[in-house]
Curated annotation (Swiss-Prot):
GO BP term (any one): tRNA modification
Regions that span the bilayer: none
Single GO molecular function: tRNA dimethylallyltransferase activity
Name of the gene this protein is made from: miaA
Name of the protein described by the UniProt record: tRNA dimethylallyltransferase
Organism of this sequence: Sinorhizobium medicae (strain WSM419)
SUBUNIT field: Monomer.
UniProt cofactor(s): Mg(2+)
Entry's EC annotation: 2.5.1.75
Region (Interaction with substrate tRNA): 40-43, 164-168
Keyword Lipid metabolism applies: no
Membership in a protein family: Belongs to the IPP transferase family.
Lineage: Bacteria, Pseudomonadati, Pseudomonadota, Alphaproteobacteria, Hyphomicrobiales
Keywords in alphabetical order: ATP-binding, Magnesium, Nucleotide-binding, Transferase, tRNA processing
């Protein structure tokens, strides 16, 4: 792969949480004169450095890292907002002749990078909040039944238990009078040409991944994750805010309230992380085509990529 930098314009690295993709990203950025750009929707938030496993100074290996920890936890941050920042960064890096190395576990970010993003309309906060409240009170199936009457085409594509997508479809319909499919047909510009990108998905063996997850979550508590959650809770944010949904926040919050012991919080947090990793693995296998190279992290770090 000596001619890699001449053959491609970007490196994309994804994989489940705790898979070792961050270390691989640093290695490849060092080798090809690049920078690392965050592609994880939780690592953008400033308060939760430890709990979201953002790389620290020693792990950055002297490589510049961008789009990490720059969003206040009380601010909503969409895929579109991330894509706009990524586009500006890529344009600058191309002028400077530096390689963008995208690293993260948010599959939608990579899909948007290489396929463009639908130009979705703004939805008033009041509409979104009201529908989310109804979801909690009435359940996803009731709202899916309503969606079937208003937008049968979308209802057929969305599972009756997928509350988040059901609410999204309903809020767009209510705000604009048009089905969400109308907006999904139009796509924004492609930022990264997939045919000129090195694309890697890191997929460790499940026992190895689970062992890493278990060790890492326990270590986080000793490294300051409890203090991070305490600071986050002091902001008194609504539970719907994305930062409040970060894995470990609710378990540590329960521990701080005396509702869980430390051991219970560790087990519950690790269990939620394992479930999340399983969903990520399923998504990567189903959504990433054969042009993505599937490797194990140990193999990746040992090879001359």
């Amino acid at each position: 792969m000596q001619n890699l930098a001449r053959d491609i314009d970007a490196i994309l690295i994804t994989g489940p949480t705790a898979s070792g993709k961050s270390a691989l990203g640093v290695k490849l950025a060092q080798r090809h004169g690049g920078v690392v750009i965050n592609a994880d929707s939780m690592q953008v938030y400033g308060t939760l450095k430890i709990l979201t496993a953002r790389p620290d100074e020693s792990e950055m290996g002297g490589v510049e890292h961008f789009l990490y920890g720059h969003v206040p936890p009380d601010r909503a941050y969409s895929t579109g907002a991330w894509l706009r920042e990524a586009e500006a960064l890529v344009a600058r890096l191309r002028i400077e002749g530096r390689m963008p190395v995208f690293v993260g576990g948010t599959g939608l970010y990579f899909k948007a990078l290489t396929g463009g993003l639908s130009d979705m309309p703004e939805v008033p906060h009041a509409i979104r909040q009201r529908l989310r409240k109804r979801l909690m009170e009435e359940g996803a199936e009731a709202l899916h039944y309503e969606l079937s009457a208003l937008d049968p085409e979308t209802a057929q594509r969305v599972r009756s238990g997928d509350g988040q997508r059901i609410v999204r479809a309903l809020e767009v319909m209510e705000a604009t009078g048009r089905p969400i499919g109308f907006y999904q047909q139009s796509r924004g510009p492609v930022i990264i040409d997939a045919t000129r990108a090195r694309k890697i998905v890191v997929l460790p063996e499940r026992p190895v991944l689970h062992s890493r997850i278990n060790r890492r979550f326990e270590a986080m508590l000793g490294m300051g994750a409890v203090e991070e959650v305490r600071a986050l809770l002091a902001l008194d944010l609504p539970l719907e805010m994305p930062a409040m949904k970060a894995i470990g926040v609710q378990q540590i919050a329960a521990m701080l309230k005396g509702e869980m012991s430390e051991a219970q919080a560790i087990e519950a947090g690790a269990a939620q992380t394992r479930q999340y990793a399983k969903r990520q693995m399923t998504w990567f296998r189903n959504q990433l085509d054969e042009t993505w190279q599937r490797i194990d992290a140990a193999e990746a770090l040992g090879e001359n990529h």
